Amino acid sequence: NLFQFRKMIKKMTKKEPVVYYAFYGCYCGKGGRGKPKDATDRCCFVHDCCYEKVTGCNPKWGYYTYSMNKQIVCGGDDPCKKQVCECDKAAAICFRDNLKTYKKKYMSFPNFFCTDPSEKC
């Protein structure tokens, strides 16, 4: 769920997720349209696509089983919740892997600037 996703992002990036990612670019946060602005925004686009493929549970609110030490390990018997966990894990790792190209100009980015045709998942 969103609270667990926040913890994963914080663990992987050492950044406060709400500040750094909740309103970043065209796809981070609620909704999304246009073309991703950079690699970090693409992480959010791919995460949105991943959530679209989830069936059988609500990705944003259902709790899943996972552990975090040096890496994130998704567990539990519920295949839907495990899939959500894997979506969140992939995005958190993607954010970490793209920290060097993170652009502050895309923080709190007004989505009315996201006018390019939207990409398909």
Curated annotation (Swiss-Prot):
Catalysed reactions, semicolon-separated: a 1,2-diacyl-sn-glycero-3-phosphocholine + H2O = a 1-acyl-sn-glycero-3-phosphocholine + a fatty acid + H(+)
Against PANTHER family, the record matches this protein to: PHOSPHOLIPASE A2 FAMILY MEMBER, PHOSPHOLIPASE A2, MEMBRANE ASSOCIATED
What keywords were assigned to this record?
A: Blood coagulation cascade inhibiting toxin, Calcium, Disulfide bond, Hemostasis impairing toxin, Hydrolase, Lipid degradation, Lipid metabolism, Metal-binding, Myotoxin, Phosphoprotein, Secreted, Toxin
Record GO biological process: arachidonate secretion; lipid catabolic process; negative regulation of T cell proliferation; phospholipid metabolic process
* GO-annotated molecular function: calcium ion binding; calcium-dependent phospholipase A2 activity; phospholipid binding; toxin activity
Function summary: Snake venom phospholipase A2 (PLA2) that displays moderate myotoxic activity in vivo, and cytotoxic activity in vitro. In vitro, shows anticoagulant activity on human plasma and in mice causes inflammatory cell infiltration and myonecrosis in the gastrocnemius muscles of CD-1 mice 3 hours after injection (100 ug). PLA2 catalyzes the calcium-dependent hydrolysis of the 2-acyl groups in 3-sn-phosphoglycerides.
Recorded protein name is Basic phospholipase A2
Its EC number(s): 3.1.1.4
What PROSITE patterns does the record point to? PA2_ASP, PA2_HIS
Q: Spell out the subunit comment.
A: Homopentamer.
UniProt entry tagged with the keyword Ribosomal protein: no
Q: Which positions are annotated as binding Ca(2+)?
A: Y27, G29, G31, D48
Among InterPro entries, the record links this protein to:
PLipase_A2, PLipase_A2_Asp_AS, PLipase_A2_dom, PLipase_A2_dom_sf, PLipase_A2_His_AS
Q: In which tissues is it expressed?
A: Expressed by the venom gland.
Q: What is the lineage of its organism?
A: Eukaryota, Metazoa, Chordata, Craniata, Vertebrata
